[in-house]
Amino acid sequence: MVVTSVVEKRLGALPVAAEFLRRLDVAGIVDEVCPGGASAYLTHGQVIEALVVNRLTSPAPLVRVGDWARTWAVEEVFGIEPALLNDDRLARALDAIAPELDRIAGTVGARAIAEFGIDVSRLHWDMTSMSVHGAFPAGDQDEQYPVIGYGHPKDRRVDLKQVQAGLAVSADGGIPVHARVFDGGAAEVSQVVGAMKDLQGMAGAREFLMVADSKPVSYTNVTALLAAGVDFIAPVPAAQVKDELYAALDLAQAQAVDWVPERDAGKPATERESYRVLEDTHTMAGRRKRDPVHRVRRILVHSTAVAAGQRRAREKRLARAREEMDRLAGAAGGRHYGTHQKITVRIGVIAAKRYVTSCLRWTITGGEGEPCALQWHFDQDVLAAEAAADGWWALLTSIPAEQAGPDQILVHYKGQGTVERRYHDFKGPLAVAPVFVQHNRRVAALIQVICLALLVFSLIERQVRRALGAEQTMIGLYPDNRRVRPTGRMIFYHLGELTLRIGNTTDPPTVQITRGVQLHLLDLLGTDITRTRWPQT
């Protein structure tokens, strides 16, 4: 009997990630920006690439990255011994890149644009927050780096401190070409000008359109954008446009927009969300008399889905308020609500809780020896005025009318969902939270590393879709073989099943491919899975 030693390791998407990291030259850029990190074994750039690949394949705390490297074919693909990826070495690499995060992000982003031919004529900017577990006392944090503190968390965990990140995502493939880490308490409205300057530096001579949420809509930000010659699109904060303006609009005069949301593509025309647009001018004045007055285009948008949602929400609020007011009317004059004051206080609570203050009318009779009674109703004129404003919202833009009509402005803005989807990937497959590191400089560095992983993740998704042609769909991703657009999550899921069978010196390693979709994805990506990250010596 012959006994042979065979070892199997997870191969997954390691060869694919290695190819994209090679084209981006992440290790080379890190080593150029942060020289002096070379040891007898690894450079800072190699360590950072290992962290990027860990996030792409099987995110783990720093102390467990070495264990991940042992079970995955990291040594075979990247030439890195697992024992070298201990938490001390990883922490030193994070400390080394922390002072140069913006420079690394900008250089890698510019490299991605040039190497992969990314169209950056339209960039979508947004910020998100990551809650952090731990005390992180202010006195123990280095103020040269983003400070972890309390803010306005997206996950509503106001009991936890946070750190924030901003992404600029291209309309072409949803590629996060620029990323930056911010203080946990930084106001989003104050970061717009800095983001614009970063994007200008990265884009160089290229002109680009900056699409964002409502944060750019301040006099200071609009002034800076106009002065820099950067066109923008952003929604107007709801408080800046009165419902009376919307209620006075004639929907019949609005222009229909030839655009259908992707989620409605397979629905009958009568069930799809539809949009109509009108246009006027929005005036913005500074606080000082000498400040110039800005007049920019305002696109008034009506959405049938938004209108239906607002109508349902109002009906729900009214129904609950009606139930509680009827109950109060029945209890008026009794032991708990025997006085005008008690009834009035309760009405105030109901009106505030159900958001019906503007339309609720009531009369209290009795008192002074007579039992109190309550009569109430909803003001139908107020409700009709609210209903007339349903579905309307507004966008501001500096794009000249001759370059884009109001319908085109709306279509451009609708791409904002791309950056939101990337944040979903950021917090989902790449597991940005929880962050198990000490010191705010390491937190910032690790988040920037995860942003690099998101860049590779997005480029792989874009490559597969582009290789599929105009339809950008394929079969084999789901058990029922329905035709769908591949997402990064699907791609990494299927490639994650690849294994590497390692024999003895006379038996070369063998890649175990178990499903046809794996071969199809590798073919679409044009990846040679036998090629290692670094030349063999």
Model-derived regions, located:
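Anion-binding and metal-coordination hotspots
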Residues: 1-18, 24-537
